[in-house]
Amino acid sequence: MQTNIAAEVLQLCRERGLTLAAAESCTGGLIAKELTDIPGASQVFLGGVVSYTNHVKEQVLRVPAALLERCGAVSAPVARAMALGARVLTGADLALSVTGLAGPDGDDRGNPVGTVFTALAAPEGVFVEQLALGGDRAQIRALSAHHALDMARRYLTHQITEGE
């Protein structure tokens, strides 16, 4: 993944006086890694949570157990709850989240490998997008992290305006 999008997101946040956090599942910290590869990231990026299990989603991000049971971990409502949880936990102005299936298998709800949900929690609301990605595990993880960062970039450049 290229770090230029991470640098652009950090610069846009810096210019607007905004802070950023992340809640990651299938990306396993790739968003945080891309952001912290950039010198000065600590002025903007407050931190991230790798919530690889439902237990951590529940206990750290406060994703309701009933939501996980009803919708499954790989779903728009859970991506939304993860982003909100990261925003509350860190006090960040913006929080990204990613949950999905990087492979090698789909889930018991019929979601195939490459099903990914990204979300951005902002003061105006929460924006959620669904992806259907191809590639191997590493490619799906990298594309998911890149898409989440691009989602932040699009929000910061007013290309996303309708949140829940």
Regions found by a protein language model. Give the residues of each.
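Short alpha-helical segments enriched in small residues
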Residues: 1-164
